[in-house]
Amino acid sequence: MAMRTRAEKRMRKFLIEQLKTRQQNGARIAQGKKSEHELIKNNLGPQVFVFRNLFSGQVLYSQVPAYHENQINQQFLSPNWQNRKPSRRQDLWKIMCVVNFNNYEYAIAAYKGLVDLRKTRDVVQKKEANEMRKKNDDGNIWYSGQFRPTYTQEAVADLTHVIDEFELEGTKIFWANEWHRGDDKHWRADLVEHDKLPVYDPRHQTVLLDIMREKAIEAFRENNTSEETIENATEPETA
């Protein structure tokens, strides 16, 4: 087995420390809901990040490329043995998709809509929602081990509903696995475009999400510049 040089060991240690710092800073920024002003101030794009729990199949929404314990508490309001409050362990939460919106107003409306739909299903209409879920022979939500795929399916359905209901044109969704998006017939082609997330090392998820953040900001600025150019060109000249 090849021995690592001291320089390689120092570089590896430095990279690990950088990843830990990135995770800690991301979690701090993720705390609490973000207004348009706060998103711009923190150099964040008009996005929603959808994380999937590998152990349970549960889904967590975030306005930033990270998540915080407070978000778990706010989005899992009525935990029970079939829908336990999940741990915030970094190795369990993996990105399912990154959703880029045309502007910050759209992104904030979508995030609120997704969280509100979750609350309606888990608290307000808990009985009705549970009746619609696939059951096993014992009458419980179908599962394999502790994994319940219904939560991922509901999250995708909620995402399609929010985009349709608010008519969020110019939406672009980057999927970690395109299988999760389902059939094209469930998505309006005039509102949303689909793509794949770049291939990445699962251990370096924070790096990927930071790249996606930067790209979203660039796309938003380019789009705004183009719109301003068109508006200026179409304005009538004053005598």
UniProtKB/Swiss-Prot annotation:
Keywords, alphabetical: Mitochondrion, Nucleus, Ribonucleoprotein, Ribosomal protein, Transcription, Transcription regulation
Short name of any one Pfam family annotated for the protein: Mhr1
GO biological process: mitochondrial genome maintenance
A GO term from the CC aspect: nucleus
Assembly and oligomerization: Component of the mitochondrial large ribosomal subunit (mt-LSU).
Family note: Belongs to the mitochondrion-specific ribosomal protein mL67 family.
Job description of the protein: Component of the mitochondrial ribosome (mitoribosome), a dedicated translation machinery responsible for the synthesis of mitochondrial genome-encoded proteins, including at least some of the essential transmembrane subunits of the mitochondrial respiratory chain. The mitoribosomes are attached to the mitochondrial inner membrane and translation products are cotranslationally integrated into the membrane. mL67/MHR1 also has extraribosomal functions, being involved in regulation of mitochondrial DNA recombination, maintenance and repair, and generation of homoplasmic cells.
UniProt-recorded name of the protein: Large ribosomal subunit protein mL67
Organism: Candida albicans (strain SC5314 / ATCC MYA-2876)
Gene: MHR1
